[in-house]
Amino acid sequence: MAHKFEIYKDKAGEYRVRFKYNSEVMFSTEGYSTKAGAQNAIDSIKKNGPNAPVEDNS
């Protein structure tokens, strides 16, 4: 599987999500106090991400 989401616990004890492609981290999220919060972030990205517009702020 080339693409995957990972939930992990950071040094501060918060749950974070990172999205990886071929072992390279493409992005990571803010910290969540619960694993359920991190899972909700994944669900939201999967639901809303495919149709999200690209905003170029360069």
UniProtKB/Swiss-Prot annotation:
InterPro entries: DUF1508, YegP-like_sf
Gene3D superfamilies assigned to the protein according to its UniProt record, in alphabetical order: 2.30.29.80
Superkingdom of the organism of origin: Bacteria
Matches recorded under Pfam families: DUF1508
Family recorded in the similarity comment: Belongs to the UPF0339 family.
Protein name, as recorded: UPF0339 protein Msl4696
The species this protein was found in: Mesorhizobium japonicum (strain LMG 29417 / CECT 9101 / MAFF 303099) (Mesorhizobium loti (strain MAFF 303099))
Origin organism lineage: Bacteria, Pseudomonadati, Pseudomonadota, Alphaproteobacteria, Hyphomicrobiales
